[in-house]
């Protein structure tokens, strides 16, 4: 009965209030930054930003977060970009809000759009990428910093990771990079913030392999310098069957070809590499 007695102005006010309340609920965010707690670099303790992208991965995101919390190095900024999860992921992010510098949950335009959001939010001198189903070893960031301090002129470090077997993060062979053939894993990848600004962001036109495009632009075009960690200095554990592994290999192969053409590789070489990779993938598929 009371609802019928509300004036038109009051109805508008109630509607606008509910609309504003619902809008606030749509933007789910948390972390230390929302409490006005910001970390800074110092000469002895440079700030390292770790970017994690997640969507509906409540089974592994907790271990990912804990592997950052448990680092022996203390000056870390963890930024987590959630693509609007509908499972228990956001509840886990809320639980660890006092250990995460900033997290946000909202719809995005895919993995690399979310990665770019994280890069734009990063404040550290160095930036690392840690997928939501991957983890670091306890001493990983100390190892990475050791390389940046020892080799002052480098732009990036590729760390050794474990993915069923030990995989070296970087082959510093110019010919391999010009062919866009290399071993590079995001869990072991770290870059100076200033160097990242020079090469820009992931190209979101690529759904599957934008990291390959970025690495190619970084090393072959911008001629940035990097180092690989010693094979005995394991940085982290790269989960098999993650995002990149579960993608349609034909779609991924076609996209790799587009990246080669975009970066103006020799067209004959591009065709040869396409068929070499196609045969390799088909053999893997049928030999299973």
Language model region names:
Residues 82-91, 131-134:
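A conserved acidic beta->alpha catalytic loop
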Residues 135, 139-169:
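Conserved donor NDP-sugar-binding/catalytic core segment of glycosyltransferases
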Residues 127:
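Short aromatic/hydrophobic "clamp" motif used to bind/position activated sugar donors
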Residues 105-122:
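Glycine-rich, basic loop-to-helix element that forms the pyrophosphate-binding segment
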Residues 66-75:
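Short, acidic, metal-binding catalytic loop of nucleotide-sugar glycosyltransferases
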Residues 1-67:
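N-proximal low-complexity "stem/linker" segments adjacent to membrane-targeting elements
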Residues 234, 246-270:
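Catalytic core of nucleotide-sugar-dependent glycosyltransferases
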Residues 170-252:
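Conserved nucleotide-sugar donor-binding catalytic segment
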């Amino acid at each position: 009965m009371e609802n019928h007695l509300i004036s038109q102005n009051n109805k508008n006010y109630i509607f606008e209030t509910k609309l504003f309340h619902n809008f606030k609920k749509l933007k789910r965010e948390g972390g230390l930054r929302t409490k006005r707690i910001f970390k800074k670099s110092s000469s002895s303790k440079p700030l390292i930003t770790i970017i994690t992208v997640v969507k509906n991965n409540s089974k592994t995101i907790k271990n990912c977060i804990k592997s950052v919390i448990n680092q022996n190095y203390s000056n870390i900024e963890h930024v987590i970009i959630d693509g609007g999860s509908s499972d228990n992921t956001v509840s886990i992010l809320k639980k660890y809000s006092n250990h995460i510098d900033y997290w946000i949950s909202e719809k995005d335009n895919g993995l690399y759009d979310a990665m770019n959001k994280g890069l734009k939010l990063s404040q550290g001198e160095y930036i690392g990428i840690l997928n939501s189903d991957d983890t670091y070893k306890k001493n990983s960031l100390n190892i990475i910093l050791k390389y940046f301090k020892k080799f002052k002129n480098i732009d990036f470090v590729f760390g050794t990771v474990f993915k069923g077997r030990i995989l070296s993060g970087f082959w510093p062979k110019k010919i391999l990079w010009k062919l866009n053939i290399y071993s590079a894993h995001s869990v072991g990848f770290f870059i100076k913030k200033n160097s990242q600004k020079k090469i820009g962001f992931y190209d979101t036109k690529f759904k599957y392999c934008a990291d390959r495009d970025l690495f190619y632009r970084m090393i072959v075009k911008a001629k940035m310098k990097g180092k690989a960690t010693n094979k005995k200095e394991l940085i982290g554990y790269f989960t098999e069957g993650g995002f990149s592994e579960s993608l349609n290999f034909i779609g991924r192969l076609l996209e790799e070809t587009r990246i080669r053409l975009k970066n103006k590789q020799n067209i004959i070489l591009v065709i040869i590499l396409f068929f070499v990779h196609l045969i390799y993938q088909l053999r893997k598929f049928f030999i299973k």
